[in-house]
Structure formats: C-alpha cells, structure tokens
A protein has these predicted regions:
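Residue-level recognition of single "structural anchor" positions
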Residues: 1-316
Length: 316
C-alpha cells in the first residue's frame, strides 16, 4: 500500500518528494502497483523514454504515458510542484482555499490555484468506491443563498444537498459515525432521493429517515426503511436523526470557515466531495495517509481542463 511510511511534516516531505524524479518513481508505483503491464500485449517490461514520462513496451513497442489518463495529463508543471500542492491540501486539517494555495505555491494567478484545487478534488472520489452499509441515517439540507431560507423543504436560492452517514448497529449504534456521502440533488422527489441512495447506500442497509413522502418507496426498493415521524421543527429532526444533522452542521461550518461561504451551486458538489474525503479520513493516524490515498486516486481519474471545469454545472 503506497500510503504507508510517508512523511508527515513539510521538511521530511520535501526530502522525499523534492525532485521530479522522486515523484515520477512514486507515481509509477501508484499507476502500476504490481509492476508495469502493457495494455496491448500484457508484457511486463518496458523502456523509459523522454525523461521517464513515457514507457515503451519491450515486446510490442506500444508507448504508455505515465501522465495520460490522470489528473496530471498535459501538465506543463513538474510533478514535484503537483505533489507539494497535494501535500499542502491534504495535510491542512481544515483544507485550504484557492487564494491560500496561490500564496503558498507562489502561483501567478488565482485561476491556476483554482484549477489545481478542482483537479485535486476530482481525485478525492475513488472510482468504484463501496457504498454505505449496515444502518444509515439519511436526510436533506440546504446550502448557500444570500439570506436564511424559509423553513421546510422549499428554500429559494439555496442548493439542495442529500446526505447519508453510517451509524452502526446494536450497542455501537450512534456512538461512532462511519462513512459519509453528500451530494447536490436536483430536488427532494422520490426519484431524486432514491437515485442518491442507489448510488451511495448498499441494499439491504437499514435506512433511517424522516417521514417525507420522497422516502416512501425505500422498502419496495430493497432497503430496511426506518421512517421516523418528526415535527416540522429543526430541533426535532436534529434530535431524532442526530448523526446526519451533526455532519450537516460540520459541513456548513467548514464551507464558511475555509471558503468563507463563497461557494456557488455550480461547483458545490466538488467542495462536498472534499469535505467527505476529509471526514472519512478523520481518524487517520498520520497526515500522510490522505496524501497517499489521493495519489492512488489521481492515476485513476479522467483528466479535465479549466475550460471544462468552468463549463460544468450541477443541479440548480
């Protein structure tokens, strides 16, 4: 596992990953953890070419780019700079804003820092990650907007966010929160909420929700549904579904504290992905664990560009 035996402090990190060559060697092992394997013929030997960023199969001659198909594809910046940025992002307990990354990395523009951060956030979601299981609390909340929204499920100007968090079973129920999932949803209809659950919660998990009609079909969908009859007040919901409402509060404070609330609907999903990544690794024994995990994910993520990131938009 690459996440082991990695440096926790900045001086040690720079000694380990201070050169492009050191970073290339580590990235090679992340991309081919069991050793090089040609995608064309399956041969296990290759020759390094072009400063070791391209590897040519010794059998069939097919060339494999170390960076192609990763978040680093087509970068004009050395890998040591990328590794440093990832370390700064993952080693900061509360995260780091684009403006702060610009300052620490000495970038010439805010756009560069913003783009790098969004590329890094894309690597915070592992492709094919496992869905939540056992007992899960599920609810929705609203994020953003210039003014406090109206009570209930109709809040103009705010993004709708669905959340699910594992709470355990039996004696451990509610004592220690497990994994978390958050996502921006188009609305709180049954179709939207069941779609969120289908992507994030395994069947036949036990799903605790309030009595909203959007959850009425969960039993038929294959879940063990625990509908709770709650009043319309926030206090009742927070009392009966404490885990997910605790997480909602933490996420909103994180958005306000690290990013000063300056997160629009268009890119909110990416920021939620970062919060989930951090929350799910909150018990890591050292700071290097999130860094190692993110590098492993980075070689599995399809590349993107600033233009694509700007054009992307989530549900209203």
């Amino acid at each position: 596992m690459l996440a082991r035996d990695l440096p926790d402090d900045l001086p040690s990190f720079l000694a380990r990953f201070g050169t492009d060559e050191q970073c290339r060697d580590y990235l090679f092992r992340a991309r081919w953890p069991d050793g090089f394997r040609c995608a064309s013929c399956g041969h296990d030997r290759a020759w390094a070419m072009r400063s070791r960023l391209v590897y040519e199969c010794a059998a069939c001659g097919k060339q494999h780019s170390l960076l192609a198909g990763t978040i680093f594809e087509q970068t004009k910046t050395g890998l040591a700079r990328w590794f440093l940025a990832i370390f700064l992002v993952t080693s900061s307990k509360g995260g780091i804003s684009a403006m702060e990354l610009k300052r620490q990395m000495g970038f010439g523009s805010y756009q560069t820092a913003w783009t790098w951060l969004h590329k890094i956030r894309r690597a915070m979601v592992r492709p094919g990650r496992e869905r939540l299981s056992e007992r899960v609390e599920v609810d929705e909340t609203y994020v953003g907007g210039p003014k406090p929204g109206k009570p209930g499920r109709g809040t103009a100007g705010k993004a709708k966010v669905a959340g699910a968090v594992e709470t355990g079973r039996g004696k451990s129920r509610g004592r220690r929160l497990g994994r978390l999932r958050l996502a921006v949803v188009e609305n709180v209809s049954a179709r939207s909420l069941e779609g969120f659950l289908g992507q994030n919660v395994a069947k036949p998990a036990s799903v605790a929700t309030d009595g909203w009609s959007g959850y009425a079909g969960l039993e038929a969908a294959g879940y063990a549904h625990e509908p709770l009859n709650l009043s319309a007040t926030w206090g009742d919901a927070a009392l009966r579904l404490p885990a997910i409402h605790l997480v909602f509060g933490l996420a909103k404070r994180w958005l306000l504290g690290t990013h000063h609330g300056a997160v629009g609907k268009k890119h909110l999903g990416a920021y939620l992905d970062e919060f989930v990544f951090r929350f799910n690794r909150r018990t890591a024994k050292n700071l290097s664990h999130p860094f190692g995990r993110l590098i492993e994910h980075a070689v599995q993520i399809e590349p993107t560009t600033y233009r694509t990131l700007v054009a992307q938009s989530g549900p209203a």
